[in-house]
Amino acid sequence: MSGDPGLEALKARVAEVPLGPEIEETGRIATLADGLVEVEGLPGARLGEVVRFAGGAEGLVLTLDPETVQVALLDPGAALGSGTEVRRTGQLLSVPVGQGLLGRVVDPLGRPLDGLPAILPEARLEIERPAPGIVDRDMVAEPVETGLLVVDALFAVGRGQRELIIGERATGKTSLAVDAIVNQAASDIVCFYVAIGQRTTAVRRVIETVREKGAFARTVFVVAPATASPGLRWIAPFAATSMAEWVRDRGGHALIVYDDLTKHAAVHRELALLARQPPGREAYPGDIFYLHARLLERSAKLSAVNGGGSLTALPIAEIEAGNLSAYIPTNLISIADGQIVTSAALFAANQRPAVDIGLSVSRVGGKAQRGALKAVAGRVRLDYAQYLEMKMFSRFGGFGDAALRARLARGERIGALLAQPRTTPLSTPVQVALLAALAEGALDDVPLEDLTRLKAALGPVLAADASLGPFCAAPDRLEPETRAALLACVRRAREAP
């Protein structure tokens, strides 16, 4: 009997059963206000631990005091009051991850908001995870193609980059990010859209837009609207990042949009003030920079040894009266690898996307830009900036010099090329063809109103040219014969009815 494998396995399982007394730590609610609970009697509680209230509601331990702990409610509808019993779970907050999240709308805890069955997770990950170390990362060298000419040509975004989208209210910030998501419908990038404190109607419009454009099945929506508890809004970006890291850590590629971190900073301030933490500049607590730094540092391009996956972040921030030097905007600008600034003046002038060329920058994306696009986009930004300056001075009097008039006309065409309606992405070959034609002067005699039609007609013309098949599949180099073929396609597109 002693050699029976089944008996030995049973003995091993019995040995694992704890035979001592089970110790359970319990406490009671001392005070309750605005989604934050002060609990007495949990001396062993840890930061980030989940506690459970009588009745099943859960909360997240945010701060530890000598006699009490501050707990953020994760179930705002729970019926709680002073004296309600609270128990430790001993577990840090985690969220479900896996392929089952694709095409779903969930809250930050992974609970469905779309009326469909519960998510069947492949694993669970803690919401607070360390960022990849220096040796675990690789250089940003592959592009995230947004389909927006102004971004891909002038401020390229690379896989693993953090590119901030910042501007005043209602200047097209979310539209830029949604366009980037829509353009991944046929790519290998999985998208995550995180709504933090947004209006439910605005989130619904985003979801419907992504659905209509065919990218819904490759997108995960993590929604903590303005009506959600402060605790849920606070954990939303961290929870969604863990969901996206599951894709990255398996060698995949993910794109995450945080909409927006200004509202996240506001809810962090709200919880800190309720917890009686000392206020600092603009009443934010002292750890506000660390809050967003530890979040955005989790976006990275991993080395080949670690699978070669990537997580690209497009955080969104809102400013007031064009003030980029406010506290939260300067924090985010210093953390990110560049920023795309939207302008209220350009938006009012009907320029879409309303990107401010002079204030926007991509610090590392240039290394990831397609070689062919880099070859034709070199002078576009400088020429357009000079045009904007000359345009301002031209209001005071006409330019008699023919060369200056030609530069003004060229600038107008650059502006018309960069203008792009929502959810109408341009492929990289089309972008290269347009900019090559611009550089060669092939668009100088094209009326501005015809450029929109030309951009729409050029894609099918390129696809029909068999000689451009290899280039369209991998537009990494622009050979002289390829440039000539692209210019010929532009001429045919101009002549198309």
From Swiss-Prot:
Residues given in the record as ATP binding sites: 167-174
NCBIfam families, alphabetized: atpA, PRK13343.1
Question: Where would you find the membrane-spanning parts of this chain?
Answer: none
Q: What is this protein called?
A: ATP synthase subunit alpha 2
UniProt cross-references to HAMAP family, sorted A to Z: ATP_synth_alpha_bact
Recorded topology in the membrane: Peripheral membrane protein
- Identify the EC number(s): 7.1.2.2
Gene Ontology MF annotations = ADP binding; ATP binding; proton-transporting ATP synthase activity, rotational mechanism
A Pfam family of the record is ATP-synt_ab
Gene Ontology cellular-component terms for this entry are:
plasma membrane; proton-transporting ATP synthase complex
Give the quaternary structure.
Answer: F-type ATPases have 2 components, CF(1) - the catalytic core - and CF(0) - the membrane proton channel. CF(1) has five subunits: alpha(3), beta(3), gamma(1), delta(1), epsilon(1). CF(0) has four main subunits: a(1), b(1), b'(1) and c(9-12).
The record's keywords, sorted A to Z, are:
ATP synthesis, ATP-binding, Cell inner membrane, Cell membrane, CF(1), Hydrogen ion transport, Ion transport, Membrane, Nucleotide-binding, Plasmid, Translocase, Transport
Q: Does the keyword Cell membrane apply?
A: yes
Entry similarity comment: Belongs to the ATPase alpha/beta chains family.
Using the chain's own numbering, where are the disulfide bonds? none
Gene3D superfamilies (alphabetical) = 2.40.30.20, ATP synthase alpha/beta chain, C-terminal domain, P-loop containing nucleotide triphosphate hydrolases
Q: What is its main location?
A: membrane
Q: Site Required for activity: give positions.
A: 360
